[in-house]
Amino acid sequence: MSDNTVKIKKQTIDPTLTLEDVKKQLIEKGKKEGHLSHEEIAEKLQNFDIDSDQMDDFFDQLNDNDISLVNEKDSSDTDEKLNPSDLSAPPGVKINDPVRMYLKEIGRVNLLSAQEEIELAKRIEQGDEVAKSRLAEANLRLVVSIAKRYVGRGMLFLDLIQEGNMGLIKAVEKFDFNKGFKFSTYATWWIRQAITRAIADQARTIRIPVHMVETINKLIRVQRQLLQDLGRDPAPEEIGEEMDLPAEKVREVLKIAQEPVSLETPIGEEDDSHLGDFIEDQEAQSPSDHAAYELLKEQLEDVLDTLTDREENVLRLRFGLDDGRTRTLEEVGKVFGVTRERIRQIEAKALRKLRHPSRSKRLKDFMD
């Protein structure tokens, strides 16, 4: 890599670490640097199913250690900074009427000052539902700003906003202003968690666990960075080196990341064909086999016509030539009202006739 290239940070997660171990690591890092970012917290905790109480306990620990939360890992982060006042749509997103109306509506809501935020939080403690609504409405822009980061992950922009709003509501209910965090700092975690979980649950035809979605997203970022650095598609070994993963694990993640393709996908310039039209049905007969089978049936019918009616019918029942179900000697005997031994004799005589060269040569070509 050239000197001008930003080295991709390796964020490895030891699967043997417990939740408390990871929290301890984060707190030690926060003490050393004075802050932690929402991104690195989310990345480190992605493999654990954390409930709201556990997350609140962690925020308490951060507060007790004077560790602040920031929205970006560092100044070299290429992600767009969160800007709650920016209500424009992200690049590539078509603004339809519902989205435009929603953005216009929340744009009319005034942002809160720090003092107003505290006053609302105090009222919420007293069970004031109006204060809850006011705090949530004032932070709807924050949800839009965060939702922009997840466009292109398989969910519509408006759906991302809706899921983020659910996280915002949870943050409003759990927020404790006495801990010293700004509400936006606290809410960012819950909004992001709600959106990422929704993407994992809804964005794919086949559901992928949240922690695997995060791994896939990280792998894609590494893959894109290496593509820029190397000028070619990176090998699994090169991706694995950046992520501290075995090449085999990288291949497994890449395989999981593949999206199913619909058999109804249009094919061709006129979109008059579908992908399913070009996929062979492994269980269906090939045209050549079908043609050979039909010819064999015709020849077999001609050969059977040379037998007596009783001989022909006995063979049809014994070998299931009409319905595919073979019968025992006893079953055929009951049909004709004779003994099983008599049926055996009729069958043997009929087969001897079929073995005669005058008849067998007509079927011999189908025996190859």
From Swiss-Prot:
This is RNA polymerase sigma factor SigA. CDD domains: Sigma70_r4. A motif (Interaction with polymerase core subunit RpoC) lies at residues 159-162. One of its GO terms (cellular component) is cytoplasm. GO terms for molecular function: DNA binding; sigma factor activity. Residues 135-205 are annotated as: Sigma-70 factor domain-2. Keywords: Cytoplasm, DNA-binding, Sigma factor, Transcription, Transcription regulation. Pfam families: Sigma70_r1_1, Sigma70_r1_2, Sigma70_r2, Sigma70_r3, Sigma70_r4. GO terms for biological process: DNA-templated transcription initiation. Residues 329-348 bind DNA. Residues 71-83 have a biased composition (Basic and acidic residues). Residues 303-356 are annotated as: Sigma-70 factor domain-4. Sigma factors are initiation factors that promote the attachment of RNA polymerase to specific initiation sites and are then released. This sigma factor is the primary sigma factor during exponential growth. It is found in: Cytoplasm. Belongs to the sigma-70 factor family. RpoD/SigA subfamily. Residues 214-290 are annotated as: Sigma-70 factor domain-3. Residues 69-90 are annotated as: Disordered. SUPFAM superfamilies: Sigma2 domain of RNA polymerase sigma factors, Sigma3 and sigma4 domains of RNA polymerase sigma factors. Interacts transiently with the RNA polymerase catalytic core.
